[in-house]
């Protein structure tokens, strides 16, 4: 009988406790930063917590970490994640632009250059909510880098990257296959838009014996294309296609228009990325390299870029400016001439809608009634994100700390919540306790007497061990 009972009894762990190394550990600075960011992502409301509470959450996640509140504060400041850090790196003042040549603007808008916001689009007359302000196709179209291998095998359009589901014979009958290489177009429009660029970028490697000095070295381009795919380096891929478009444009207008856009060097942008631990840069996927490694990568890309354009080399500084210019002006990888003039506001007055067919471009629609003389704005970030996240993304990717009305209101609300949360919580707890006591003892209340045998010592509270005895059925 006793043996039967013993077989039904076992010692188990409760509260889903997991064995953890309890020995103290001093975490690496990147571990601490990653932990804080993980906390913020799991619960965005924690971004407005004070340092003591944030430190407590870090310790709760990693009880064995030997880390002080002071070190957490110092690391967040070092990596530009302390929101009230006045030393956060910005680069908006280093962004330059000039008036755009040969631009055909919509009838109801015009460009104004200001000292504080640079170029901007302003309404020439009142615009009603829902009105189509303008639509435009890309000045520079960049196909999806991820579809490069599908383009090579005729599984995607060689110009726009759209996946193809038609049979090869049908494509041939429509005259959409290339008569030199294996690539195909998805439509007459794409074949027309590609023009001579397709053959310049991908065909002259078929004439290795030609003594004619090539404007574009196709073999070097295909090598760069594969390198960009391997490294997931969309900006290098994009500026190579942009420069190819510019040097083959006999009018020279495209180069002038690209040069007139908001310009900044990529190494300047990287300082902001590096100061934020690389975590919130949507254009770089959060990848972080130390400065020396990043410069080495840029120089490899630069050498490959130069080999593509043997007759039209650019200086290394200009290469970095091209990359920075592309990164702050592109939308869905494409570059639009008029849309690139829209400045940011977290509560923008326009809605920019990209088409499912990326070659069709975009539409800009009035998000509310816009008065004559009012600046047209768009939002560079998701307006539903917390003010802390929006401002980090804007600082890293576009170089400024937003001070729009929405940001100011959100910050004020955060401060009010922080100051009133504890007081309200305590007040609610007291009210609940008083109500429960009143319900339990009635209106007369109770009076407690001190026991005659009381010796002044408190009895220890009941304490449960982490191990309990369970009986198995």
From Swiss-Prot:
Biological process, per Gene Ontology: methylation; negative regulation of gene expression, epigenetic
A GO cellular component annotated for this chain's UniProt record is:
nucleus
CDD domains given in the database record: SET_SMYD
- Which GO MF terms does the UniProt record name? histone H4K20 methyltransferase activity
InterPro entries named in the record: SET_dom, SET_dom_sf
Q: Which domain of life is it from?
A: Eukaryota
Give the E.C. number(s).
2.1.1.-
> Localized where?
Nucleus; Chromosome; Cytoplasm
User: Which reaction(s) are listed as its catalytic activity?
Assistant: L-lysyl-[histone] + S-adenosyl-L-methionine = N(6)-methyl-L-lysyl-[histone] + S-adenosyl-L-homocysteine + H(+)
* Enzyme class, first EC level, given as a word: transferase
Residue ranges annotated as coiled coil are: none
Q: What keywords is this UniProt entry annotated with?
A: Chromosome, Cytoplasm, Methyltransferase, Nucleus, S-adenosyl-L-methionine, Transferase
Question: Where do the SET domain residues begin and end?
Answer: 107-381
**Protein function:** Histone methyltransferase that monomethylates 'Lys-5', 'Lys-8' and 'Lys-12' of histone H4 (H4K5me1, H4K8me1 and H4K12me1, respectively), thereby controlling gene expression and remodeling chromatin structures.
As for family, the record states: Belongs to the class V-like SAM-binding methyltransferase superfamily. Histone-lysine methyltransferase family. SET5 subfamily.
Q: What is this protein called?
A: Histone-lysine N-methyltransferase SET5
Q: Specify the species.
A: Candida albicans (strain SC5314 / ATCC MYA-2876)
